[in-house]
Each structure stands twice: as C-alpha cells, then as structure tokens.
UniProtKB/Swiss-Prot annotation:
This is Vacuolar fusion protein CCZ1 homolog. Keywords: Lysosome, Membrane. One of its GO terms (cellular component) is lysosomal membrane. The gene is ccz1. The keyword Nucleotidyltransferase does not apply.
Amino acid sequence: MLMISPRMASGMQEKQYTPSLLSFFIYNPKFGPREGEEEKKILFYHPIEIEKNEKIRNVGLCEAIVQFTRTFCPTKPAKSLHTQKNRQFFHEPEENYWMVMVVRNPMVEKPNKDGKPPTVEYQEEEIIDSVYGSVLQQCYSMYKLFNGTFSRAFEAGGVELLTQKLEKFFYRYLQTLHLQSCDLLDVFGGISFFPLDKMTYLKIQSFVNRVEESLSLVKYTAFLYNDQLIWSGLEQDDMRILYKYLTTSLFPRHTEPELAGRDSPLRPEVAGNLLHYGRFLTGPANLKDPEAKFRFPRIFVNTEDSCEELHLIVYKAMSAAVCFMINASVDLNREFCEKLDSLVGPQLTLLASDICEQYNINRRISGPEKEPQFKFIYFNHMNLAEKSTIHMRKMASVSLTSVHPDLMKILGDINCDFARVDEDEEIIVKAMTDYWVVGKKSDQRELYVILNQKNANLIEVNEEVKRLCATQFNNIFFLD
C-alpha cells in the first residue's frame, strides 16, 4: 500500500510504502528428492505467474536455510530470515510440510533534485517477527478449520488432491490478508467476551441446553452477541480460529441495522405471536424459496486427536448469533432447517432483545463514557480473553487502531521481551512523542497501557496504571 506524506518543501513529496506480501508458498522436500524433480516439491506458489525456475530456486534457498539452521538447533530450525528489502517467515505445521511467507519491508521513497532517481530507504526494523510469524500460523489454522490437515488430504487423494485444496483455499484467503494493519492482536489471537450479568448468562445457558435437547443432532454450540463470545462448547484452540473466521469474514458480509431493545417500536409485543427475526447466515438464504439449497460449510475440529468433520450452521437474530455444529455424515434437509428455524428463531429474538435491554441498563448505571487519558490491550493466556480500547474493527479483516504506528511498534517490542522470559515483569517506556507505554506480565496475563501524560514522572505513571487496574480489572490480581 502506498501512502504519501507532504514532508518535502517545494511541492516534492515522500512516498511511504507499507508492508506487503511478495510471495507465499508451501512445499514438501520429500516429494521431489532427486535432481530434476525439484518442481514436485512445490504444492502451492503465489503469485502463480512466477516463472518455474525462479520458484524452484526460491524453494531451494528456503530448504538450504532450514537445513543450515538445523545444524545449530535440530528441534527449532529457522523461523525468519532478515534482508534489507524483505523478510521471510518459515513455519512447519506438519512434519516435512513447510509454509513460507515473504513480506516486503516498509520503505520511504525520497525525491532527489536535478531529475535524479528517488532515494529508497527500507525500514526493516519496523517489521516485528512475532506478529508476521503469527499471521503465517493463522494461515495454516484457517486452512485446517475448513479442510483438515495437509496429511489428511494427501492420504485421501495424493498430491493432486492436496494441491487442489491448497489452490482453492489460499487463492481466496491470501486476498484477505492486510499485512499493513497486523499488530499485537495477531500474536494473541484472542477472543473478545461479552460482559453479562449472572441472570442473563443463565438464560443463555438454559437456551443452549433446550435447543441441544430438542435438536439431538447438534454436537457443539457457540453463542455470540455483538461479535463477542458468550458461550462455547468447543475446545479453546478450535473456538479461537472459528471466532476469527466469524468476526473477520462471515459477520461483516452480513451486516444489518441494529434492532433495539424491548421498548423499541421496532419490536412490538403481539399477544400469542412471538416475534421472529431469525435467519440463516450459512445454508439457505430463504426457507420459503422452493429452490433453496441446504448446503452448509464443513469445518474440522479436534484435529490433534479424532479429527471431527462437522456442518457449520450459523443462525442470527438481531445482534445474537448461534453456531450449531452437526456431524458431517448427517444429511441436513429442508425439514430439519424448518424445525430449527421455528424452534430457535422466536427464542433467539426474545433473548437478543433481553441482552440488549440489560446491556443498555448497565451502561446507563455506569454513566456516560468519557474519553480516557489511557488506552489499553489486555490478554489472558489461560482463557484467551482479549480486550482492547485501541482497536476499532470496522471492516472485514482490517483492524483499525486509534494510536500512532510507532506506539504499536513499542507494544510489539515489549511483548517480544515478555516472550523471552517466564517470570512476571513490568516494562515502562517513554516514547519520543512524549507518550508513556507500560507493559505488565503477571500470572499468565498481559496488560499494555498507553498514557497521554507527557509531564508525568515514573511514580505518577505507575499510580495511573494501578488506578486503571482497579477500575477496569478489579477482579484480576496483578502483581506490583
């Protein structure tokens, strides 16, 4: 992506280029071990128009780097390679299957006088390994969610089936990568949980139990409100990648005007006739259509153990969405979908209205939101809970931040420092822009705070962070 900043005098402008994807490929060195068979190793290569010999050369170089680094650390070969112009990231998700992502470093093009070519300055220090390494791991996790493992496809149909699946999935998925907006949240890959009072939570639990009892085919259920998770029957790692798919891909494609609470004219009470705002986000677009298709996307969970293949039914009413997962061997027909719609639609509509009403009451009690003097990111490694006042997710796949990229870079650097040690610790940084950045790591939890108080000293900054912990995280213990 190109950004132009008018820093130069006399009408001359600098051009700033953000990180971008140069290439992405997957190979298995066991598939072409002999000379002259090197092309057989390559299972997928983007961009597709790259000449064959260049593909073979690039894959061969990556093989050599991996083998060379294995001599120093057999269990942990290369994770990344730094060059002036780009950075390469390596990931071996399954034995002998290697994924490589090459990212062009950000750069600034400075114009020269007298008609000389512009001077290019590469800003390789702006790229954080942990962020883009996590993006590469997400690529595999998302593929595995919809296709199962690489080895599963190979066992089912050999190299031909595997390459077909890789091309079909990654051709579309790579277009959704927005490398210029990747940051600390990609490292965490967390889940945003919706805050609820106990009574409303019990209503949701009761609703899930009733539906699972009435629709015995349902194996797992997940309940979300306002793109935040409330209930899940899936394992954490499966839910975290399904959550990412729902919130960055499926839900943004089906945005709708928010419907208000029970006292809204949009939801009149009609005696003896429960209101029904429910609809399928996956599967049939309209149940009344005689030509409706009853095909649902399939997902794979518990791939480390039994590897279950499931139908994914996502059903939504107002701001509430429920995911029903059913064994893929079951044939889902019109009768089942109509039963689900008539059972879930009215109940979910009522429940969504109740949640909205309760949420609005709680907001009125807590008073109007003021613009705080601090912004923060919180992550809990134990339950994957994530909370950020820095990010404003408004578009599919794109994470917009409300702070300067330099501050996001500092957050990433602090996180890298935390990852190097197991002990709890705290880091305080004074940025060049006079902002204070604080990182706290305590008992599997991480908190990052950005303070806009340029005249504050270390003691005052520490007190401010303590106040934040007391107001925002009063039930969480952070070591001082």
